[in-house]
């Protein structure tokens, strides 16, 4: 007996893509004329990016370079909290810790399920921890749900994984 088609909605970042974007941004920062002699760098930790530069203006330029490289690599910028405060670091440098969103919280999963229910399609959305599983009889209904989620203006990044059909 065949199982109904389904997929999961998650908010997970592809680490290799992020590392590639950061290394490309660092390469550009090291070769750009306006960054010569500056101590600008980007580090990746488990749940955040640490951006360091000599002043706030250069830090904003580092953010611009990084976001450009991430957009080119297909990384959703909504997965990052670039609104965090700039703090003084060692010496004459400033630092910004950018939080990386990993997984959906309860409020975000509720937003997704209510959006799916408002579509009035023959699909079921169930919350499974930090993801939402969508099951339906027809693949066309699932594709409509995916299109609705892509078009929705959420303040977080939603990805689709675990396709079964």
Curated annotation (Swiss-Prot):
Alphabetized, the UniProt keywords read:
Nucleotide-binding
Q: Which GO terms describe its cellular component?
A: cytosol
Q: Which InterPro entries match?
A: DUF520, UPF0234-like_C, UPF0234_N, YajQ-like_sf
What Gene Ontology molecular-function terms does this entry list? nucleotide binding
Whether Transmembrane helix counts among this entry's keywords is: no
Q: Which domain of life is it from?
A: Bacteria
Which CDD domains does the entry link to?
YajQ_like
- Report whether Transmembrane helix shows up as a keyword of the record: no
So what does this one do?
Nucleotide-binding protein.
- State the NCBIfam families in the record: PRK05412.1
Q: Which family does it belong to?
A: Belongs to the YajQ family.
Q: What is this protein called?
A: Nucleotide-binding protein LEPBI_I1392
Q: Which organism is it from?
A: Leptospira biflexa serovar Patoc (strain Patoc 1 / ATCC 23582 / Paris)
